[in-house]
Amino acid sequence: MTINEEFALRDQFGWKPAPDDGRFFITAVSGGEEDGSIGVDPDGRSIASEINFNLTTRLYSGAEPQIDHIIRSQYGSYVDALNSLYGQSSTESSTVGALNVWNLRSRVSIVLGGTRRFIDVVIESPAMMDLTEAEQRYFDEGGDLLGASTIYWRDL
């Protein structure tokens, strides 16, 4: 998608662009803070590489324990819905949270992440999948972390 198509999608959902940079935006669940972004393909600045946004409000760290159960239940509902649309996801989990990934035939990937505090989603373009696969080949062939030119960390 082009950046302008992503902006149109952002606007269609009623998300409010940041005043200084429309690639960042505020969703209805944000509590007024920027909680979404549109990534730009480094090779083609008019092409979007990904869109990232929260599906729930980001809770403060001292939230009531029962909220954790609600977020986990909601996360499971999102996983079930996406599994029914796109097939079984790959899953990773840790003490911090869970991550489910759907790699579609179109080479778009959907990454759903959940912690005790929030649920977010990243929808990546085929170009991002190409980059991820190239990075994995680099490491599979013995490349080390210090020699990697591009590393993506997800704050879940």
What are these regions (language model features)?
Residues 1-96, 107-109, 115-156:
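Short helix/turn-capping signatures at newly exposed starts of structured segments
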